[in-house]
């Protein structure tokens, strides 16, 4: 623990542009909340498909399902969650607005989706559009799946439902096409006459589309014009889904989390540095190799511009030129072990330092910083080999942001990450990027990463026997 004299020495001996130690009040180093129960299960990939009535949502869902034949996939329709029409409303059912958000039992929809995300089977009601009741027996049994497609006109309306989705698709179609499809569908499938369909369209469907459905288009990640006729868009969506299904569950939740592709070589190096019997020399050697891979991967996320050069043969090569304004910031002291790899990759790079030190049991922290004066103009590679609770990372990132560094300009590099720390950092800072080589099982009761690799700084710098 740093004494007052230590603080004064550091502050007075440093004649540069940093402010020494900062007293941070009320910053508890408590363990973050445990991951939600559903994250302990294999996380399904949830796709929301919204759009106006008869825009082609069902066709798009069917085509996605057909191309996901090798995956467990299921479609959940918002139509299944209509409220029952009571006896009073049934007398004037033609004046009942089925396109209003209040027509749906959103709470039941949320309950069913939460159970599916937790790996539990659910019974979903079957809604009868002739009796306007959801008591058709038997209910539809939906089992847990790798992919859940949630389809409906208003699934983007409630933010709680939107937050369940990993991908949001809006199916767009011309108004006249949607009207023609609706007339055909409602007369054939729902037993309605054309006059009733047109009356309902002008009274409820069209106003609801303009008031409630169209405004949710802004939440979509992907907009598909022409619906099921757009085969190129659907093929690209399916490719993206296959990519996500091959990733760690946390990568499906947080698009700003990147885990380098695992190979036998990488797993072999992890085996060596995790082994408590590995010598200091071998630990440093293989740690440096892994760190170099993480650094190289992190550099690949920097912005670039196209550049043409002339080769010794006189030919023109079209390549790229990465941004010049770059610096590293290591979290003392374990983060300093990553500096050599960064210098080897980026000759002459400036490297700053941050020390986050807990003082006593009151949760207060001392922060020491030594950063480039123009850090607000640079892309920052934040270095810390282990992401555990996420407390230190959060404080380091907040400090960088307070210095004017845009959140999107920070790339956090580490060797291993605990899910608890990933959740904390990604939720608080959704625009930073985290690059790691492996996701751990979690934290134990002593807040240590498991299976982990012990106290990294002590093992790397040879102070574990002191």
UniProtKB/Swiss-Prot annotation:
Binds 1 Mg(2+) ion per subunit. The magnesium is bound as Mg-PRPP. Keywords: Allosteric enzyme, Glycosyltransferase, GTP-binding, Kinase, Multifunctional enzyme, Nucleotide-binding, Transferase. Its cofactor is Mg(2+). Allosterically activated by GTP. Pfam families: PRK, UPRTase. Disruption phenotype: No visible phenotype. No decrease in uracil phosphoribosyltransferase activity. Uracil binds at residues 454-456. It comes from the Eukaryota. GO terms for biological process: cellular response to hypoxia; CTP salvage; UMP salvage. One of its GO terms (molecular function) is ATP binding. Its EC number is 2.7.1.48, 2.4.2.9. Residues 41-246 are annotated as: Uridine kinase. InterPro entries: P-loop_NTPase, PRibTrfase_dom, PRK/URK, PRTase-like, Uridine_kinase-like. The keyword Isomerase does not apply. It is an enzyme of class 2 (transferase). GTP binds at residues 280, 289, 323-326, 378. It catalyses: UMP + diphosphate = 5-phospho-alpha-D-ribose 1-diphosphate + uracil; cytidine + ATP = CMP + ADP + H(+); uridine + ATP = UMP + ADP + H(+). 5-phospho-alpha-D-ribose 1-diphosphate binds at residues 333, 358, 384, 389-392, 455. Pathway: Pyrimidine metabolism; UMP biosynthesis via salvage pathway; UMP from uracil: step 1/1; Pyrimidine metabolism; CTP biosynthesis via salvage pathway; CTP from cytidine: step 1/3; Pyrimidine metabolism; UMP biosynthesis via salvage pathway; UMP from uridine: step 1/1. NCBIfam families: PRK00129.1, PRK05480.1, udk. Involved in the pyrimidine salvage pathway. The uracil phosphoribosyltransferase (UPRT) activity, that catalyzes the conversion of uracil and 5-phospho-alpha-D-ribose 1-diphosphate (PRPP) to UMP and diphosphate, is unsure. In the N-terminal section; belongs to the uridine kinase family. This is Uridine kinase-like protein 3. The lineage of its organism: Eukaryota, Viridiplantae, Streptophyta, Embryophyta, Tracheophyta.
